[in-house]
């Protein structure tokens, strides 16, 4: 066995670097990777790599179940979810479980069931992961050719891609079935302040669904993040389900065309880089969705969006001052613009003051007060309902401010409450993860392309200066 110089110097230290400790087919000598390089040692051991992936899935599902039960145990029904730092229960509530009109939690038992089911699933996955990592066959090709693969086998790789796409499509259909037949989902736009309802009138028009994809991503347009009714969301999932299932069948039945064979690098590390790029895109989209969208992420559970809290503040003070006798239609602010109401660049009546920048916010508590030309002065004077006042006052005091280290509120505000919105948590974490996954994509894509070109080894180790230096000791 050839001992590396750096290993020989530390022969007295008992670590996995020592050649004495050998994991069959998983040591540095046979794989080129040391123990800390993790699954890189298993690149060509399909059975062991399966074990690693199943065990990883078990860890993910265990977190979901344990965190779910933790949130149930700490949940206080009298307080809104977003005041309690919850990130899982809002997702379950959005799916229509355990909630009623106005997003009020009526029953926490479905949440408990969800946690227990995830824990049980994680035990099954954990057992499977340990079995395949320690006891199962090292490679699957010989015994189970259907599950075996070689990374450079393009046809097999696209077949695996196809199977994954079909599973994603079926997952998409699960949401559609829940919304249509199994109790419905929570609709924040339901009259009177939100309720659980079955979706009856799906949007299936391709011009509407794909129109979202063609929108500008910037203000007033907002690309797919601008979706603001459940019919479009569930209809989009119908389209997505069919596209994924048919795309999956296509990839199973066909072989890659010549242009695709030339365009892609066909190696394990290349597939890793493609996957990381996809996850990075998902992370950035999720970040924007949870930050700006109050239909897929109802404010009753996640707290108001930033623009929503700002508009709620303007509305709350309009209500107060109108009661005190102010003429909100004509009062001037310090800049000479309207103090309570003004006009947008396109002529609609909007809230005045600093919140003017959020004039294109749409929120269920505000829309009933709009007419054909923006906010309707008549409705503002005669039609404001108590639930709208209560909700806007609540949202005004729960803006999604605060940092990842749980210090809530405006940094300059001496009376700030220590409140951090789940929107802050979820959008920041997904942005950060999206960024790191993108860096991982660049790293592995670079390595994969270099390997394909035949120069992945980096610096020639024979010429490395350290080899000619005296040992430190």
Curated annotation (Swiss-Prot):
Give the protein family.
Belongs to the PsbB/PsbC family. PsbC subfamily.
Q: What is its main location?
A: plastid
Which SUPFAM superfamilies has this protein been placed in?
Photosystem II antenna protein-like
**Keywords from the UniProt entry:** Acetylation, Chlorophyll, Chloroplast, Chromophore, Manganese, Membrane, Metal-binding, Phosphoprotein, Photosynthesis, Photosystem II, Plastid, Thylakoid, Transmembrane, Transmembrane helix
Q: Does the keyword Transmembrane helix apply?
A: yes
Chain positions recorded as [CaMn4O5] cluster binding sites: 367
Q: Can you quote the record's cofactor note?
A: Binds multiple chlorophylls and provides some of the ligands for the Ca-4Mn-5O cluster of the oxygen-evolving complex. It may also provide a ligand for a Cl- that is required for oxygen evolution. PSII binds additional chlorophylls, carotenoids and specific lipids.
Q: What is one term from the GO cellular component aspect held by the record? A: photosystem II
Q: Specify the propeptide location in this chain.
A: 1-14
Entry-annotated residues carrying Phosphothreonine: 15
SUBUNIT field? PSII is composed of 1 copy each of membrane proteins PsbA, PsbB, PsbC, PsbD, PsbE, PsbF, PsbH, PsbI, PsbJ, PsbK, PsbL, PsbM, PsbT, PsbX, PsbY, PsbZ, Psb30/Ycf12, at least 3 peripheral proteins of the oxygen-evolving complex and a large number of cofactors. It forms dimeric complexes.
Q: Which residues are recorded as modified (N-acetylthreonine)?
A: 15
Q: What is this protein called?
A: Photosystem II CP43 reaction center protein
Record-linked InterPro entries: PS_antenna-like, PS_II_antenna-like_sf, PSII_PsbC, PSII_PsbC_sf
The keyword Signal appears for this protein: no
């Amino acid at each position: 066995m050839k001992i590396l110089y750096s290993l020989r110097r530390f022969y007295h230290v008992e670590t996995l670097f020592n050649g004495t400790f050998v994991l069959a087919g998983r040591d540095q000598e046979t794989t080129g990777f040391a123990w800390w390089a993790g699954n890189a040692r298993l690149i060509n051991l399909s059975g062991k790599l399966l074990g690693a992936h199943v065990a990883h899935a078990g860890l993910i599902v265990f977190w979901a179940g344990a965190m779910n039960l933790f949130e149930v145990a700490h949940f206080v029904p009298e307080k809104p979810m977003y005041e309690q730092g919850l990130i899982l229960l809002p997702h379950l509530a959005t799916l229509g479980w355990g909630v009623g009109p106005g997003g009020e939690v009526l029953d926490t038992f479905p949440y408990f069931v969800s946690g227990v089911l995830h824990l049980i699933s994680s035990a099954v996955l954990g057992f499977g992961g340990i079995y395949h990592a320690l006891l199962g066959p090292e490679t699957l090709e010989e015994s189970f050719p259907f599950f075996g693969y070689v990374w450079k086998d393009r046809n097999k790789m696209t077949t695996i891609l196809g199977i994954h796409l079909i599973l994603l499509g079926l997952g998409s259909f699960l949401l559609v079935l829940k919304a249509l037949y199994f109790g419905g989902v929570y609709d924040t736009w339901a009259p009177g302040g939100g309720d659980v309802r079955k979706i009856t009138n799906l949007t299936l028009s391709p011009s509407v669904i794909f129109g979202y994809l063609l929108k500008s991503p910037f203000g007033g347009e907002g690309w797919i993040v601008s979706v603001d009714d459940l019919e479009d969301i569930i209809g989009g999932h119908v389209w997505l389900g069919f596209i994924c299932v048919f795309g999956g069948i296509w990839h199973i039945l066909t072989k890659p065309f010549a242009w695709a064979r030339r365009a892609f690098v066909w190696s394990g590390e290349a597939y890793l880089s493609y996957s990381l790029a996809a996850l990075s895109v998902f992370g950035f989209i999720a970040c924007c969705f949870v930050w700006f969208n109050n239909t897929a992420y109802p404010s009753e559970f996640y707290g108001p969006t930033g623009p929503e809290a700002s508009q709620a503040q303007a509305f709350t003070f309009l209500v107060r001052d109108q009661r005190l006798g102010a003429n909100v239609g004509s009062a001037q602010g310090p800049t000479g613009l309207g103090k309570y109401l003004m006009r947008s660049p396109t002529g609609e009546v909007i809230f005045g003051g600093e919140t003017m920048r959020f004039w294109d916010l749409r929120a269920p508590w505000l829309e009933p007060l709009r007419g054909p030309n923006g906010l309707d002065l008549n409705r503002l004077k005669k039609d404001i309902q108590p639930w709208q006042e209560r909700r806007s006052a609540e949202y005004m005091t729960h803006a999604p401010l605060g940092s990842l280290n749980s210090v809530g509120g405006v940094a300059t505000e001496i009376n700030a409450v220590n409140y951090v919105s789940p929107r802050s948590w979820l959008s920041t974490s997904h942005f950060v993860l999206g960024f790191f996954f993108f860096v991982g994509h660049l790293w592995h894509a670079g390595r994969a392309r270099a390997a394909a070109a035949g120069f992945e080894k980096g610096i020639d180790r024979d010429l490395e200066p350290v080899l000619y230096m005296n040992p430190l000791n």
